Amino acid sequence: MRAIGVIRNSRRERLSRAEFEELLRSAGYEVLAIVEQNREEHPRYNIGPGKLEELKELVKELKPDKVIFANRLTPSQAYNLWKELRIEIMDRWQLVLEIFEKRAHSKEAKLQVELASLQYEIPLVKEAIRRIRLGDRAGFKGMGEYQTQQYLKHIRYRMGKIRDELERVKADREVKRKKRENAGFVLVALAGYTNAGKSTLLNALADENVEAKNQMFTTLDTTTRRFRLGTKRILATDTVGFIDGLPPFIVEAFHSTLEEIVKADIVLLVLDSSEPWGEIRRKFLASLQVLRELKALEKPIIVALNKIDLIEEADAEEKVRLIWELARERGISLEDVVKISAREGRLEELMDALNRVVLKLPKYGAFRIIVKEPEKVPAVMALINSVGEVLSVEYGEKTRIDAYVQTGMVGEIKKMGAEIERLNHSGEGEELEQDEGYSDGG
């Protein structure tokens, strides 16, 4: 398919030409030309009338299959452009949905794409009905008013059915998530702008040699892998990539997938460090906006600057500094900003940061464990090592073990005959209250 792309930039809306061209290529289009204009939005055509005439001439000369706008078009603008150009018109979000449709493999992903597409169609169908009533016989996809009204009813019915199916998927996922939490797994969500290298990072964390494609939106299906961080068991989940100005109808349609971020213990926000700072800044802010909409900004967030193998060390350090500075300016609390190369497996800074953050989670606590019977020490130590991290051991008439332990395992340790108390900030033990929420197995 051959397309002409159109970008309109203004003081309020700055769009990346490089990103738009990458979207077009990802959707499989041969880009014949890109038409650009700097002006505020024209209410009738989005671009100005003069630029529209230029576009008409290009369409006659190049004979594309479609004209695709980098901007969001109103239904009225899309119709007016079609009437002038007599060629299929698409906007940014139709283009994204087309890519999503190509990438969706699981039943859930296909349902989410269909839901988003139907939500996008509703205002277009309503505009078609309005125009029919004004005497314009264009209709929607050649349909008359009655057929268009019936199609609108069908859309709403189908959306209801899809939402019901997605709710069932969500319930099943919640059951699995609870089982994982109860089994002591720490849940980490990989989030970030599309094509930042999240899938490559997931493979590196899980030590899997699976090729990750260098293209936009390779991940629509939720993918989870497990790995160990010392004694800690981690489940990392790759999520659908963000894009600048992600509209509410796409966020809503993909909520069951994006919910993995909301339910995670830690959010790992991946950025491509090889890009110019202006692009990193734009994508970082766009990612933060999606996290804000998901109400996930209060989660522990680690920013991973990926692809450092492609830049100089001084450049990487400067970008780390700028990320910290930008986060402070925006009032965003970050746990850490680390440099990684997922492709080369250079993850040392990330693993150190994850280890520190995991031990600060509510599901972990610092405890002093007293074992009075020497023969029970090996079994208690083995249990602690399987669900936590030993800080120090003092052997004597009583064995004293200071350790980070999953709080849900306190009851199991007590059942082995050990005494346990929480460590305060000075390293002294404090007796646990009965109502502190720890099960003793009874």
UniProtKB/Swiss-Prot annotation:
Question: Which terms in the GO cellular component ontology are assigned?
Answer: cytoplasm
UniProt similarity note: Belongs to the TRAFAC class OBG-HflX-like GTPase superfamily. HflX GTPase family.
Q: Where in the cell is it found?
A: Cytoplasm
Q: Which domain of life is it from?
A: Archaea
Cite the entry's keywords alphabetically: Cytoplasm, GTP-binding, Magnesium, Metal-binding, Nucleotide-binding
- Answer yes or no on keyword Magnesium: yes
Q: Which CDD domains match?
A: HflX (cd01878)
Q: Where does Mg(2+) bind?
A: 199, 219
Q: Which residues form the Hflx-type G domain?
A: 186-362
**Function recorded in the entry:** GTPase that associates with the 50S ribosomal subunit and may have a role during protein synthesis or ribosome biogenesis.
The UniProt entry, under InterPro entries, shows: G_HFLX_dom (IPR030394), GTP-bd (IPR006073), GTP-bd_M (IPR032305), GTPase_HflX (IPR016496), GTPase_HflX_N (IPR025121), GTPase_HflX_N_sf (IPR042108), P-loop_NTPase (IPR027417), Small_GTP-bd (IPR005225)
| Cofactor(s) required, per the database record | Mg(2+)
The protein here is known as GTPase HflX
Q: Which GO terms describe its molecular function?
A: GTP binding; GTPase activity; metal ion binding; ribosome binding
Provide the assembly information. Monomer. Associates with the 50S ribosomal subunit.
Q: What is its main location?
A: cytoplasm
